[in-house]
Amino acid sequence: MPNRHRGEIEAEIGGFRRTLVLTLGALAELEAAFGEGDLLALAERFAKGRMSARDLVHIIGAGLRGAGESVTDEEVARMASPDGAEGYVRIAAALIEATFGTADA
């Protein structure tokens, strides 16, 4: 069961229920992948609500690795979501919300 206080979520991807979390290391990985200089810039990028398929692969991959899975982005790109593209978007959105919260919070 995911620990929401630590920013963990659970999602079905690649045929298994998996835990994802954006640890400090995972966030640093995303800063580098997106060319953002700090966490505020990363949060602002996510707040825009526009994500490419490549963005989703980076976010989901970082979340899986943050939870301890040894997966590459190439492996993540081949993992199926039972809800297709919409499922990937929901997973990334839930992970970002668990990490950064919402504007209402």
Which sequence ranges carry the predicted segments?
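Charged interaction scaffolds used for protein-protein
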Residues: 1-12, 17, 36-54, 65-105
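Short capping micro-motif at the N-terminus of alpha-helices
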Residues: 20-22
